[in-house]
Swiss-Prot record:
GN (gene name): eng1a
Lineage, broadest ranks: Eukaryota, Metazoa, Chordata, Craniata, Vertebrata
Basic and acidic residues bias locations: 43-56
Single GO MF annotation: RNA polymerase II cis-regulatory region sequence-specific DNA binding
Family (UniProt): Belongs to the engrailed homeobox family.
Source organism (scientific name): Danio rerio (Zebrafish)
Residue numbers spanned by region Disordered: 1-29, 43-105, 121-148
Protein name: Homeobox protein engrailed-1a
Compositionally biased region (Low complexity): 68-102
UniProt DNA-binding region: 143-202
Keyword Heme in annotation: no
Pfam families (alphabetical): Engrail_1_C_sig, Homeodomain
Any one GO CC term of the record: nucleus
PANTHER family, alphabetized: HOMEOBOX PROTEIN ENGRAILED, HOMEOBOX PROTEIN ENGRAILED-1
Subcellular location: Nucleus
Length: 231
């Protein structure tokens, strides 16, 4: 019986001398609801916890209370400079972590979805700021193309060319532009407008259009229908 008690006592002493396991940080679940994701502070708390966790002091094993005085004094002398260095690192880390937090408070917090959508070309570009342009009265006048004021001589020559042929070729257009001092686009537009005026005033339709109209396949004419009201 005495031997068993001694064996149990030795086992208890051995178990008491073992160092306690380090305390692990509690796992925190993030709520991935839409309302939480759209908040500007989504993910900020997790980053702060990581910074403090990285800069924190790891738990060291406690020295055995039953050890002699020499070992305890030696461990205290060794742990004191280490703890002082670690405390300095913690202070430096806290000062560094506090400085970006102040800068982030000055800046506007944008939600995370702004950096992951089609509104930004690059994930780090952030939301775009569009500058409003000042409206000038001169812009409206510049957009409109000024009408060409033809002289009497230019009009006579253009009408003569139009009587010979309603469709002008490129060579004739270049020759008229050099002779009359006009651009080729001005001459081309004048011929197009002249043909449109004649077609609109005469109302002439070609044989193919008349045939299609007879079959009910082509009819661009508009007619007004008046409904008779019953008295």
């Amino acid at each position: 019986m005495e031997d068993q008690r001694r064996g149990q006592g030795e086992e208890e002493d051995d178990s008491g001398s073992l160092p306690s396991p380090p305390l692990l940080p509690a796992h925190r679940n993030t709520d991935f609801f839409i309302d939480n994701i759209l908040r500007p502070d989504f993910g900020c708390k997790r980053e702060r916890e990581r910074v403090t966790r990285d800069s924190g002091v790891r738990p060291t094993a406690l020295p055995d209370s039953r050890s002699d005085g020499v070992s305890s004094s030696a461990s205290s002398t060794v742990s004191s400079p280490v703890s002082s260095r670690q405390s300095n690192k913690v202070e430096q880390g806290s000062s560094k972590s506090s400085s970006p937090s102040k800068d982030s408070q000055k800046q506007i917090l944008w939600p995370a979805w702004v950096y992951c959508t089609r509104y930004s070309d690059r994930p780090s570009s952030g939301p775009r700021t569009r500058k409003l342009k000042k409206k000038n009265n001169n812009t409206e006048s510049d957009d409109k193309r000024p009408r060409t004021a033809f002289t009497a001589e230019q009009l006579q020559r253009l009408k003569a060319e139009f009587q010979t042929s309603r469709y002008i070729t490129e060579q004739r257009r270049q020759a008229l532009a050099r002779e009359l001092g006009l651009n080729e686009s001005q001459i081309k537009i004048w011929f197009q407008n002249k043909r449109a005026k004649i077609k609109k005033s005469s109302g002439f339709k070609n044989a193919l259009a008349m045939q299609l109209m007879a079959q009910g396949l082509y009819n661009h004419s508009t007619t007004t229908i008046q409904e008779e009201e019953d008295n």
